[in-house]
Amino acid sequence: MAGTRILLVDNGSYEPAATLGLRDLAKSVSFLTKQEVRPVSTMHSTKIDPALLGGQPAVIFEGAVQQAKADGIDELVVLPLFIGPSRAITEYLPKVFADARPGAMKLSIRQPLFGDDGFELTGMLADNLRETGWTKGSGTVLLCDHGSPIPEVTACRNALAASLREELGLKPAELIACSMERREGAEYDFNKPLLEDALQDAKGDAVILMLFLLPGRHAGPDGDVATIAKEHAPAGLRWKLSPLLGSHASLPSLIELRHSVTTDLKPAKKFVLTTVLSMGLLPVIISLFAPKDMGLLGRMMLWLGGLAAIFVALYLYFRAKYWKKA
C-alpha cells in the first residue's frame, strides 16, 4: 500500500476563483505539514472549463477516491474547508467513499474549522472586521453565513457572534448574526434573521462580516450577498463587505492544526488502560523497593510522586505519538 493521502476539501463552486483559491490554500497547508495536500471539492467544480483553471481540471471527491484506490492508498485524510459540521462532511463524503468500494482503504475526516469552540475563527473574523476600517460605534456588524438546513452549523455561526460580541464589547443589536438564505418552512427558522431583514436594523457604517471562505457565486464582489445588500439596504445606510476568511493569513495554520489533532478514540482508551495498570502496579513497586522502616506518610508521598510521574510521562508519550504534527 502507498500510505496516506491528504485532501483539502471544500463544497465546490462553478466559479473558477473558488477552485484557484482552494489550490492556493492547499499549497500553503502543504508547506506547513511538509506533506502534499491535494485540493478537492465535494461537487460542482468539474463543470469549470479547465482553460479557466490554468489548464488543470478541478477534482471532486468521487474522482479523488477512485484515484486513491487505483494508487493503492491505505488512508485518505480529509481536511474540511467548512466552518461547521455540514452534511457534506458528515454524510456525503462517507457515502461517496463507501460507494467506491474502497476495500481496506480508510477514510479519516478531521474537525471542521470551528473545532471545539471557534476560538481561532473569532480572532480571524475580528481581524477581517477591523480591516474594513470599522471601529466600535461606527456601525452595525452583520455576521453573515450562507444559511444551513441543519441547526448544528447555524449554532457555530451564533457561537461565533457571541464570542465576537464579548471580544469587541458589543451588544446584540450592534452585532447581528444572519443568513444569506434559508429553506422554506418553520423547521428552518433557526437560520433567522435573513440578511435582507437584518439590514433593516443596521445603523451607521454597517459591515457585512463574511462567514464565507472562498469567492464564488455567493461571496464574490458581485455575488449574492452583495446583491442582497444593494437591493435591501435602507436608503441612506452605508455598508461594505469584509474580506473572506479564505484570505486571512492564519487560515493555513488553522487547517494544519485541524490536521495535527485527530479525534480517534483509540489513543484515549490506551491512555486510560495504561494509567489504570500503572496505578495498580505502583503500590507493589513501592513495597518492593521502599525502605522497610519507611512510615505510612513517606509511602504516601512516594505513591503520590509516582502517580504524578506516571501521568506526566504518559501524557507526553501519547501527545507525541498521536497528536504530533504530521
Feature-to-residue mapping (PLM):
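Non-cytosolic membrane-interface motifs at loop->transmembrane helix junctions
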Residues: 295-303
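N-terminal signal sequences
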Residues: 271-292
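Membrane-helix interfacial anchor on the cytosolic side
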Residues: 310-326
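Transmembrane helix-loop junctions and nearby membrane-interface residues
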Residues: 43, 287-292, 317-320
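Core hydrophobic alpha-helical transmembrane segments of single-pass membrane proteins
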Residues: 279-283, 304-312
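Extended amphipathic ligand-handling, pore-lining, and cofactor/metal-binding catalytic surfaces
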Residues: 1-266
